[in-house]
Amino acid sequence: MDGRTKVYFTSDAHLGSGYHADPRTGECRLVRWLQSIEGDARAVYFLGDMFDYWFEYRTGVPRGHVRFLGQVALMADQGIEIHFFAGNHDVWFADYLEKELGAQVHHEEALVTLDGKTFRLAHGDKEYCGLSWTNRFLYRLFRHPVARCLYAAVHPRWTVGFALSCSLRSRKRGVRKATVGQVPHAYHNEYFEIEKEWLVRWTKAHIEEHPEVDYYLFGHRHLLVDLALRGEKRIVILGDWLQYNSFAVWDGSALWIDQFLEEEDQV
C-alpha cells in the first residue's frame, strides 16, 4: 500500500441510463478514471446512483456494468477500500457487492474520520426529501421491506424496462423544472445562487447542532459545489458523470474537486 495516500469520492454515474449518448462510452470513461487513480488511492467512496437501476434478486443482479464492476474488483483485490452508498436509483443493494467485490455497502449516511477530520457522507436524497411530501413518500416507499418483496415477485422482464423508462422520464422532467415549490431546482450550476440550494441550506442548519463535522459530501443533485461554511468547514456536492465527469480528492490535508478530462474534452 506504499504511495496510496488519497481518498476519492464520486457519485451519479447512472450506468445503464438512456440519458448517456452512448452508455458503453460512459462506462469505459469511468473505468479509465478508476485505472488512473488505482496507484495512489487508499479508498474510493461511491456516494450513490452509480447505477441508473439496481435490484438484487436472491440469485441474480441486473445485466451489464461488467467493465466497471471488474475494475472495482481489481482495486479491492489490491487492498483499496471500496465503499458504495445506496442512492435513490440504486437503493436496493443486498450483499452482492460485498460478497463478489469485497466492497462495504452503506444504506444510510456515514460519519467517517480521515486523518483527524470528520466527513459526513451521504447520497443526499434523504436530506433532499424534506423538500416536498412526494419526495418523503417515495423515499419511504422504496425502502419499505414490503414494497421490496412485492417488487421482487414481478418478473425482471417487466421491472427492468419499467424502472429505466421511469428514470429517463424523471431526468427529462428535472432538466425542465425550474423550482420545487419556492426552492430552485435544476441539474446544472448556472441556474441560481448556490446559497439557495436545498442541500446547502440543510447543511447550514445541521452544522449548528453538529459542530464536530468538518466536511459534508453529497451526490444526488448533479451540481458541482464546493462552498465554505463556517471556519474551515465545507460542503461539497460531487457533480456527476453525465456532464461533469467529476470527483473529489482528499490527500490527508486538503480536499478539492477535480474532473477527469481526456484529450477530446480539451479540444
Where does each model-flagged region fall?
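Active-site metal-binding loops of divalent metal-dependent hydrolases
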Residues: 11-14, 49-50, 88-89, 124-125, ...
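Flexible, glycine-rich phosphate/dinucleotide-binding loops
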Residues: 16, 91, 128, 244, ...
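Active-site-proximal loop/helix segment associated with metal-binding centers of metalloenzymes
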Residues: 124-201
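Short, solvent-exposed aromatic-acidic interface loops
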Residues: 258-266
